[in-house]
Amino acid sequence: SLFGILSTLWSELTFSNYARLLTDTPFLRWMLNSLIVSALAASVAVTVTTLAGYAFARFRFPGRKYGLLVMILLQMFPAGMAMVAVFRLLQVMGQATGGWIGLNSLLGLSLVYIGGGIPFKTWMIKGYIDSLPKELEESAYLDGATPHQTFRQIILPLLGPILAVVTVFNFITPYSDFIFPSVLMQSGDRYTLAVGMQGFVSGNFSANWSLFAAASILGSLPILALFFSVQRFLVQGLTQGAVKG
């Protein structure tokens, strides 16, 4: 009886929806746009937050305390509150740069995610660096290492687990977001994957759930690839301190 029920749910196995998705819709264009925005946002944000987190954790300078406080305060407000300001800012930047950075620009959209992800991720990396013993750096200084060499050769290799987490966060957020791209992207060839997929099911009487499901499966592949590529760093972070000695 179980097989009889299953046969009524899936009466026929077909891959025709994948073929239609790839040939009759700009799905690949949408996915490429999402990958460009996500990769750019993740790479820049990880670089900036790593340097900022190290500076806040290891150096004492004027404005350090207030800088950390401002980053906490920025996280108290939802991103949607800044929608009008971001829209107007990109509108002005688009006029000033000839459209390179502005509305309907992948670079402009990337900058939105870069700016939005820096405060919280900086705190994450700072907290992780605070847990590392300062004696490691002091030993390197005694051996004649410069601050740059100490960071690059001593600290950076130890940041694998937290950098993996920050990279995943900074990649998934722009890749799956719908609100900002739907407002800032104004032409179909600039849509990200989430905005494009919404068009499959937005009609009251023409929702195409088959194409939507096929797009969901294919759209999840980059996320899976990213998780598998950083899996060993995530596991390393989870198991640190689990074994004594």
Feature locations, PLM:
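A structural signal for multi-pass alpha-helical bundles of membrane permease subunits
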Residues: S1-G245
